[in-house]
Amino acid sequence: MRLSTSALVLGAASSAVAFDQKVLGDLKKPAIDLDLSSWLNFGEEITAEAKAVWEEVSMLAPDAVEAFKKQVIGTKPKKANRRPDNHWDHVVKGADVQSIWVDKNNEKHRKVGGRLDNYNLRAKKVDPSKLGVDKVKQYSGYLDDEEQDKHLFYWFFESRNDPENDPVVLWLNGGPGCSSLTGLFLELGPASINKKIEIVNNPWSWNNNASVIFLDQPVNVGYSYSGGSVSNTVAAGKDIYALLTLFFHQFPEYAKQDFHIAGESYAGHYIPVFANEILSHEDRNINLKSVLIGNGLTDGYTQYEYYRPMACGEGGYPSVLSESECQSMDNALPRCQSLIKGCYESGSAWSCVPASIYCNNAMMGPYQRTGRNVYDIRGNCEDSSNLCYSGLGYIAEYLNRQDVQDALGAEVSSYDSCNMDINRNFLFAGDWMQPYHQVVPNLLEKIPVLIYAGDADFICNWLGNQAWTNKLEWPGHKDFKNADIKNLKVEGKEYGKIKTSGNFTFMQIYGAGHMVPMDQPEASSDFFNRWLGGEWF
């Protein structure tokens, strides 16, 4: 996840769009309706606090607000050159899969539910010897939404161990707008890229005992592209369901395995909705067994309360702010939470956008202005041009090589680790502060949920993640809140704490920032394998 204090205020109007957003409760309806005329009467739809924030932005950037009123500014489409179907080893037509019927309880049913006729899946076998990322079987390709001109890129790695029986995991990075190939090469995939742009094997890769799909989503992220854009989590969920359905149809040898979704950061938004979308289809070929969210943003109302404690010495690391700065964050919290509450209650972008603008500036701004790494409170940014990490630059250089793009079938003209247009689109669609934690109880009725957090992260810190899991209202709330906290160990060495009850588990991982598998590879491999093995559920 990347946040820019100045961009949030001064870029507000120039990047914004006028939205009428549906209330979250109905996840089957499109979340967004464009309505430019709504600017004229939006003051009747939002709280006085939210309106005041809009007025503050108007004073800071009047020209930008005028531009906001007049036009919708969307994501610039990526330049792409679609490869012909004969380039691919497999082309799966969603309409064909949608038309398959089977007998069930003496009645005819579609084999898999959901609308698929606008989707197609393309796949090619990747020659491991060409790239040297791993020796295992690999596929890459695109999910195409032909109706919406959306094309999502994925890269699949088979398990190094027992692919016929090991589970399958979908990995999602956050942002919103950051490529999941970051997770592949910087965190948990079979290899990393060094400063010489060379492949380096990762002995702690998550595909040691699981097959892993790395997906660039939403569109216009990484190798994915579109003539349009996606600016809300619910819409993106339909694409994920289609991708998995068509992938498992083409490769049924993986469909019989257990399936899990894992991710970090803004995936705290994505994963509850994506899992809920999958579970909503009774007839499906996706054997979803659990979800894992690392250092996620899921419940803004609760989590934003813990930026001040984390920055001011209450999260296990020394304070990085002065007393007066800490006090100013305390003073700002009531207004921040009031704005978020208004967003939760209305679901309207007119309420949710001011909440994001005000809270990000008031609760994150003081920390950001120190120059410290928002993803790791232990130090400063090593590379401000690459979200604090030089490794992102190495990855981008590698993935922009023509031989790499040809080997994978990539169709875009360039690769970027993060697309900040997407980040702004989600923000100004009101998606940022939506209460996606309210979807989690529905998941807990059906599957286990793991929330893990590196304890040195600031931006989605462990204090906030611990707090929202303790506060979440679900039938097992009391038992979970009162559950014993136990040590996590590998090879006799303690690396964290765990609390688990029923289908809900929370982990605090020591000495790790926002990207736990990067900072603590052995520890993350340990809890990942134990989780997939069902130790805590």
From Swiss-Prot:
Propeptide stretches in the record: 18-124
GO cellular component entries: fungal-type vacuole
Secretion signal span: 1-17
One GO biological process term: proteolysis
GO MF, one annotated term: serine-type carboxypeptidase activity
InterPro entries in the record: AB_hydrolase_fold, Peptidase_S10, Propeptide_carboxypepY, Ser_caboxypep_ser_AS
Entry annotation: catalytic residues: 265, 457, 514
Gene3D superfamilies: 1.10.287.410, alpha/beta hydrolase
Keyword Protease included in the entry's annotation: yes
Subcellular location: Vacuole
Catalytic reaction(s) noted: Release of a C-terminal amino acid with broad specificity
Name listed for the protein in its UniProt record: Carboxypeptidase Y homolog A
Organism: Fusarium vanettenii (strain ATCC MYA-4622 / CBS 123669 / FGSC 9596 / NRRL 45880 / 77-13-4)
Gene that this sequence comes from: CPYA
